[in-house]
Amino acid sequence: MISSEEKVEFLRKLVEIYSPTGRESEAVKFIVESFESFGVDAYVDEVGNAIAIREGKGPRILLAGHVDTVPGIIPVRIEDGVLWGRGSVDAKGPLATFFFATLESNANIIFAGLVDEEGFSKGAKNLDVPRPDYIIIGEPSGVDGVTIGYKGSLTAKFVESVEKVHGSLGVDAAERLINRWLEIKSSFGEGFDALSGRIVELHAYERDFDFYGEMVINLRTPPGYNPPKGWEILDFVPAYQVDRRSPLVRAFVRGIRRNGMRPRLKKKTGTADMNILGPRFGVDAVAYGPGDSRLDHTPHERISLSEYLLAIDVLVDVIEELKGAKERAAEESGEREAGKALSG
């Protein structure tokens, strides 16, 4: 049995390792060596992900969190049962939850500590593991919540070049780009099923014979959204959502209730590796993890250690629910086949 103190110490050490996107190797090494210290084989794959595979009973479950964080050092400290530090919520708290659920579950589990999630998801796009039956992504949903949908993400670039005229006679490149943005923004709305977004970069300057400008935007896209023709698309990941009647969602509902809480199903307006891995493997995916996502990327990032420890218990129960669901399905199938044989 792994003690609560060991679980807290692992998370503290993981958060202490500064690992912004592109600098994940030290944290990945720590995770691999920690698995090996518990007798679990682990390795670093070709793109830098930390991978551990445990053979056990039930369906194969991929637990995939991310090792990288956004930049910004927050001094790591524990005060009044709360751990402060960059990545404590997004998403080393969920990743540590997955680490211990892997160790404490006698199940078929693939653990993946992914790189570049805060960038262009190189880790998820190049993940080379056996096809899972279910995917759980490590992102803060709150200990009593499970995320069943994320909006998509589209990054596009616009360029304008306008021949010089007298300043009072025409619209320059910057104005054209701003007008283009206002046209796009006019279709924005609120919530999961609406388009939203922001300007990422806007540069405009005068050259010898023209006014030149570039604009990069990022849109959060609802399910079913298709980029307009003619846009220069730098990156596009479609929205993803799972049916709330999925066995995976039902397992979370039961696991959360078993630990004395009322489950909350969430759809988020951000984007995660769930958008990539769910469609890629063609199986149901949700996101789960301790922490308040409103603290993501902020200078106030911190996580309740009691919530973190409880999330491990919830996830272990969820995995047991999934094992039981497969066993029940096999029994029911066997009973049906036996019934057919007797009736024949």
Swiss-Prot record:
Pathway(s) it belongs to: Amino-acid biosynthesis; L-lysine biosynthesis via AAA pathway; L-lysine from L-alpha-aminoadipate (Thermus route): step 5/5; Amino-acid biosynthesis; L-arginine biosynthesis
Record: residues binding Zn(2+) 2: D90, E118, H297
GO biological process: arginine biosynthetic process via ornithine; L-arginine biosynthetic process; lysine biosynthetic process via aminoadipic acid
Signal sequence region: none
Annotated active site: D68, E117 (proton acceptor)
InterPro entries, A to Z: ArgE/DapE_CS (IPR001261), LysK (IPR010175), Peptidase_M20 (IPR002933), Peptidase_M20A (IPR050072), Peptidase_M42 (IPR008007)
Keyword annotations of the record: Amino-acid biosynthesis, Arginine biosynthesis, Cobalt, Cytoplasm, Hydrolase, Lysine biosynthesis, Metal-binding, Zinc
Recorded superkingdom: Archaea
Family of the protein in this entry: Belongs to the peptidase M20A family. LysK subfamily.
Assigned GO CC terms: cytoplasm
Record-linked PROSITE patterns: ARGE_DAPE_CPG2_1
Enzyme Commission code(s) on record: 3.5.1.130, 3.5.1.132
Compartments, record wording: Cytoplasm
Protein name: Putative [LysW]-lysine/[LysW]-ornithine hydrolase
Catalysed transformations (reactions): [amino-group carrier protein]-C-terminal-gamma-(L-lysyl)-L-glutamate + H2O = [amino-group carrier protein]-C-terminal-L-glutamate + L-lysine; [amino-group carrier protein]-C-terminal-gamma-(L-ornithyl)-L-glutamate + H2O = [amino-group carrier protein]-C-terminal-L-glutamate + L-ornithine
Residues holding Zn(2+) 1: H66, D90, E139
NCBIfam families hit by this protein: dapE-lys-deAc, PRK04443.1
Cofactor: Zn(2+); Co(2+)
Stated role: Catalyzes the release of L-lysine from [LysW]-gamma-L-lysine and the release of L-ornithine from [LysW]-L-ornithine.
Primary localization class, coarse: cytoplasm
Cofactor binding mode and count: Binds 2 Zn(2+) or Co(2+) ions per subunit.
GO MF annotation terms: cobalt ion binding; hydrolase activity, acting on carbon-nitrogen (but not peptide) bonds, in linear amides; zinc ion binding
Pfam families to which the protein is assigned, alphabetical: Peptidase_M20 (PF01546)
